[in-house]
């Protein structure tokens, strides 16, 4: 006779699923991340171009 198969608990064997966690952190959309990155790149380019003239 075959032995009964042991089953795992329905909670995913104790593994934490991060998308279930509710945090109070600042949430930013992917578009926001891209926009912020583009702004920082533009600022970096402007500072390299005009920084020596402005800051001596």
Curated annotation (Swiss-Prot):
The keyword Chloroplast does not apply. One of its GO terms (cellular component) is plasma membrane. It is found in: Cell membrane. Signal peptide: none annotated. Keywords: Cell membrane, Membrane, Protein transport, Translocation, Transmembrane, Transmembrane helix, Transport. It is a single-pass membrane protein. Residues 1-29 are cytoplasmic. One of its GO terms (biological process) is protein transport. Pfam families: Sec61_beta (PF03911). The chain crosses the membrane at residues 30-51. InterPro entries: Preprot_translocase_SecG (IPR023531), SecG/Sec61-beta/Sbh (IPR016482). Residues 52-56 are extracellular. The keyword Transmembrane applies. Belongs to the SEC61-beta family. NCBIfam families: PRK01253.1. Involved in protein export. The function of the beta subunit is unknown, but it may be involved in stabilization of the trimeric complex. Component of the protein translocase complex. Heterotrimer consisting of alpha (SecY), beta (SecG) and gamma (SecE) subunits. Can form oligomers of the heterotrimer. This is Preprotein translocase subunit SecG. It comes from Thermococcus onnurineus (strain NA1). The lineage of its organism: Archaea, Methanobacteriati, Methanobacteriota, Thermococci, Thermococcales. The gene is secG.
């Amino acid at each position: 006779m075959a032995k009964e198969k042991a089953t795992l608990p329905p909670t995913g064997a104790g593994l934490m699923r991060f998308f279930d966690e509710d945090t109070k952190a600042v949430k930013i959309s992917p578009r926001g991340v891209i926009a912020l990155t583009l702004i920082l790149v533009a600022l970096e380019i402007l500072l390299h171009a005009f920084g020596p003239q402005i800051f001596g």
